[in-house]
């Protein structure tokens, strides 16, 4: 679905021959050979029991319920962190609560922390790390469960993104450890993934992520519709800024409209994903398709009867190829060409100075559908150090639920998806051991 801003610009673009933004199909690289875990027995149990009874009778589903019932909007994750930490301690894990400051370095109003855990008596440097995040986007949506045909649909904020992954990772680890108490597993549940990745960055820069790396594999949990993800697009953000001179709207020649100055640059930037790279556009790739541009917010002026002295727009770019620095150069040239070199219109990258290129991930475990995704994750926020033996550290991205409902008013997941994710995480752990 196009944004209202892109539709507005597209209307203007009909006069200059701009192309629309076609919706690219999501690339599926290989079909699944997994049969899942929801067979006749599970279907029969669900069909004959009330939803609440099924959930209450399952430690796994009860853990997921209790976690979703805790509001943990980014910046306010403490209660969820305490819940996860206390549960793991009660199940014979050593738990480290790693403090995470706010992005500007000041501690937020409510203390928050990452939860890092490993089996008591085992090494604090596990070979296999399962990780996801406990923060959610706003607003909080209460937990609910209802029978739907032969399944149970669980609704609530975080039920998909990413408390479904958290619950499945915890119980996959418990299942593996019950069979093999010496399994070299670790769990990491971070804060702030939804608003900047500060939690993972703090872990990445800490002694808990040593060099050489102890990790043989890192398994990231996000809603992937139970597919194993071979990679996701990169990310670049910036603000497009224009400055002008205020004046009475009855005498516009006495001022200079920042909004009018901004529009040609916006139109050009909005099309950069559709323009071939050889013609000055942003690059595409066979794996990830087109680079996409979203102008998410515009603001300018103070009143309709005042020539606006300032205007700006926030832009998010999902990179299909290349590096953030290369994309910044393309954006700068596009703005310069669109404005005739007007120095009062420029892209400001200072607020989003990092960015990252496309992230290629491992898919060497059989039994999964393989796909790519367009959303961002904490994958680039975890620096992977070289191992002492020179072997590569495998990175997997997998989880239950659909990203298409993850941030919406109807975020929901099914019991069948959660149970299949439990099996999927076990399979990934066993392959990495």
UniProtKB/Swiss-Prot annotation:
InterPro entries in UniProt: ArgE/DapE_CS (IPR001261), Bact_exopeptidase_dim_dom (IPR036264), Peptidase_M20 (IPR002933), Peptidase_M20_dimer (IPR011650), Peptidase_M20A (IPR050072)
Q: Where is the signal peptide?
A: 1-18
Residues annotated for Zn(2+) 1 binding in this entry: 161, 194
What does UniProt list as catalytic? 193 (proton acceptor)
Q: Does the keyword Signal apply?
A: yes
Its EC number(s): 3.4.17.-
Report the GO molecular function annotations: metal ion binding; peptidase activity
- Positions that bind Zn(2+) 2: 161
- What does the sequence similarity comment in the record state about its family? Belongs to the peptidase M20A family.
Provide the protein name: Probable carboxypeptidase ATEG_02905
